[in-house]
């Protein structure tokens, strides 16, 4: 039978999702735990691979097993063998035609960025950081230029293995929350920015490369129209440096309601 799992993880201690020799990865930790609980080797396929240091709030995987066990048993049993920074949130039997990656209509990511004169401490590794104030309207205008189907070569890592740089970016939403009293030394208020990205798929480092450009625009180093120029140039060298992975979260994939998966993974009304 085929099982689907929803997984959350803190990516700080891992060299990304995908299994690699001689380094610690989320996939290896999950498959080791599943294998111990199932008492047979388990190979998983995920909805979206994350890089080193990137977190997952609702990664979805599927695997095949000859065992017929209750869903709750898979959750409790697998979690019993997982490290504290990885957890199975839900388990569900799915049709053999379900594929965690190929069945996904889209993927959702969020980048959480602390704007503060002082670097993060408690949140270190879980938020990005910028020590200058950002212009929301300029960043949102620039982000809107990216929405739609485009060649995203300017935001593609040199190691990217995707067959095509053309992707459909459905939305970039930018908001600022949690303003606190002004910093006593510098006189302005720290806040948390949230950048949410929705696309059919993403290139390697695509979001972090876009983030580097949005922050440069938000700081006034470039105009919003620079984003249009980058799209036309299709040159990675012309864009800003890759932003840190710390504040990047894979919110999860989006599936058709017909698969019967938990609500957080289901396409909203009117999708796409």
Swiss-Prot record:
Gene3D superfamilies: Pseudouridine synthase I, catalytic domain, C-terminal subdomain, Pseudouridine synthase I, catalytic domain, N-terminal subdomain
GO annotation (BP), single: tRNA pseudouridine synthesis
Binding site for substrate: 109
EC class name: isomerase
Catalytic residue positions: 51 (nucleophile)
CDD domains in UniProt: PseudoU_synth_EcTruA
Catalytic activity, reaction form: uridine(38/39/40) in tRNA = pseudouridine(38/39/40) in tRNA
EC id: 5.4.99.12
Keyword check for Ribonucleoprotein: no
Molecular function GO terms recorded: RNA binding; tRNA pseudouridine(38-40) synthase activity
Cell inner membrane among keywords: no
Pfam families on file: PseudoU_synth_1
Keywords for the protein's UniProt record, in alphabetical order: Isomerase, tRNA processing
Binding partners and assembly: Homodimer.
Membership in a protein family: Belongs to the tRNA pseudouridine synthase TruA family.
Protein task: Formation of pseudouridine at positions 38, 39 and 40 in the anticodon stem and loop of transfer RNAs.
The protein's name in its UniProt record: tRNA pseudouridine synthase A
Organism: Verminephrobacter eiseniae (strain EF01-2)
Lineage: Bacteria, Pseudomonadati, Pseudomonadota, Betaproteobacteria, Burkholderiales
Underlying gene: truA
């Amino acid at each position: 039978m085929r099982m689907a799992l929803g997984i959350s993880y803190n990516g700080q201690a891992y060299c990304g999702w995908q299994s690699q020799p001689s380094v610690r990865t989320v996939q290896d930790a999950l498959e080791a735990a599943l294998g111990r609980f199932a008492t047979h080797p388990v190979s998983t396929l995920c909805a979206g691979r994350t890089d080193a240091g990137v977190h997952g709030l609702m990664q979805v995987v599927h695997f095949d097993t000859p065992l017929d066990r209750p869903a709750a048993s898979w959750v409790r049993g697998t979690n019993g063998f997982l490290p504290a920074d990885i957890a199975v949130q839900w388990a569900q039997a799915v049709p053999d035609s379900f594929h965690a990656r190929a069945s996904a209509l889209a993927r959702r990511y969020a980048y959480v960025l602390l704007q503060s004169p002082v670097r993060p401490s408690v949140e270190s590794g879980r938020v990005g950081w910028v020590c200058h104030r950002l212009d929301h309207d300029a960043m949102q205008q620039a982000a809107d230029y990216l929405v739609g189907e485009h060649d995203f070569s300017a935001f593609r890592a040199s190691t990217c293995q995707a067959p095509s740089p053309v992707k459909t970016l459905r939305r970039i939403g930018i908001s600022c929350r949690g303003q606190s009293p002004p910093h006593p030394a510098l006189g302005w208020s720290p806040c948390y920015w949230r950048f949410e990205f929705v696309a059919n798929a993403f290139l390697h480092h695509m979001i972090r490369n876009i983030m580097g450009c949005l922050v440069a625009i938000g700081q006034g180093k470039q105009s919003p129209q620079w984003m249009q120029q980058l799209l036309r140039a299709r040159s990675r060298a012309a864009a800003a440096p890759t932003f840190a992975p710390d504040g990047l979260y894979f919110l999860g994939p989006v599936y058709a309601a017909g698969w019967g998966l938990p609500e957080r993974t289901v396409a909203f009304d009117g999708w796409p």
